[in-house]
């Protein structure tokens, strides 16, 4: 190790845990030594913009209103509010990378505010009489789902080296799963280290348990990315005629999905089940094995389309 401007120091350890995040340099260093690390990488095709705000003196956080949610998806824009401490909060806006005109406009902080105030669920937070900005609008791209394999054909690329969290597996940050998957992954590693002493066996079992615990989360996130990409591209072509599901199976899935969204707004049992998935307290969709969730969701069949739509301007109105 070498501190900036200081002397180099050698540290010896039984194991190395790489928690360096998505930009960890250890992967490239291993590759430079000849290691083969295979990676699954999928582009989310979005640009992520945010701006930070603070509530004005005497203004309280808006009450949560299902009719005007502070998070949502208009197809061409995804948005969300992230409350902080002391009246501070952030607003995020995600736009498909090919929406060049919209992306150019939203870089301007005043335009960012105008767009946010045109969305009822955000205006409740960022209206001129509610909050003031504490930063300009800023963004980042290169948003990918990635899975790096440190075991290939049951052969570890390195012994006593363990990548955890985003250094090994990451999903679209829009879903807010990074900290949770990192914690799950760390517990998986701790258990492996406690149960197994062989460096080789530790690597193999850690890889297997990573697949068991994180692959369902990764697949669900990736599927959501693909759906969002398809919807955004379709709206760029013709937002007045969104794609309709083809085939009886897809139509039924869409019908049930609309009912599920409506049920999470109006049935506490369904909401609790959905939140267990959202907060990664169980594997994605596990709550759907509860017959009560199915039964209660079916009551909303045919009632979950229009009522679940997020209020906001059309793409044409924004442009």
Where are these regions (language model features)?
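Generic alpha-helical structural element
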Residues: 15, 19, 101-105, 178, ...
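Glycine-rich, flexible loop segments associated with nucleotide phosphate handling
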Residues: 7-12, 159, 246-252
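Long, contiguous hydrophobic alpha-helical segments, chiefly transmembrane helices and signal peptides
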Residues: 16-22, 26-30, 46-52, 79-82, ...
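Short secondary-structure transition/capping segments
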Residues: 30, 89-98, 169-177, 241-259, ...
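FAD/FMN-dependent oxidoreductases across multiple families
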Residues: 99-220
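C-terminal helical "tail/cap" subdomain of flavin- and related membrane-associated enzymes
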Residues: 190-319
């Amino acid at each position: 190790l070498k501190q900036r401007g200081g002397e180099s120091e050698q540290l010896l350890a039984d194991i190395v845990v790489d928690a360096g995040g998505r930009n960890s340099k250890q992967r490239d260093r291993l590759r430079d030594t000849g290691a083969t690390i295979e990676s699954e990488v999928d582009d989310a095709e979005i640009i992520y913009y945010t701006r930070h705000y603070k509530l004005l003196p005497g203004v309280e956080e808006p009450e949560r209103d299902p009719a005007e949610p502070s998070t949502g998806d208009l197809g061409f824009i995804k948005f969300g509010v992230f409350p902080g401490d002391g009246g501070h909060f952030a607003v995020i806006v995600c736009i498909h990378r090919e929406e060049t005109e919209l992306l150019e406009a939203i870089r301007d902080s005043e335009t960012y505010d105008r767009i946010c105030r045109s969305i009822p669920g955000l205006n409740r937070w960022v209206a001129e009489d509610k909050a003031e900005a504490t930063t300009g609008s800023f963004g980042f791209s290169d948003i990918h789902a990635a899975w790096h394999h440190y075991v290939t054909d049951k052969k570890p690329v390195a012994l006593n080296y363990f990548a955890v969290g985003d250094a090994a597996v990451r999903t679209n940050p829009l879903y807010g799963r990074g900290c949770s998957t990192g914690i799950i992954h760390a517990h998986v590693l701790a258990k492996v280290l406690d149960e197994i002493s062989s460096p080789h066996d530790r690597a193999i079992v850690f890889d297997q348990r990573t697949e068991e615990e994180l692959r369902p989360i990764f697949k669900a996130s990736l599927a959501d990315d693909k759906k969002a990409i398809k919807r955004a591209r379709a709206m760029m072509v013709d937002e007045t005629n969104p794609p309709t599901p083809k085939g009886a199976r897809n139509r039924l899935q869409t019908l049930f999905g609309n009912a599920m969204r409506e049920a999470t707004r109006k049935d506490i049992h369904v909401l609790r089940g959905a939140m267990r998935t959202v907060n990664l307290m169980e594997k994605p969709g596990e709550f759907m094995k509860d017959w009560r969730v199915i039964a209660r969701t079916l009551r909303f069949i045919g009632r979950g389309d229009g009522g679940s739509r997020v209020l906001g301007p059309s793409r044409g109105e924004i442009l």
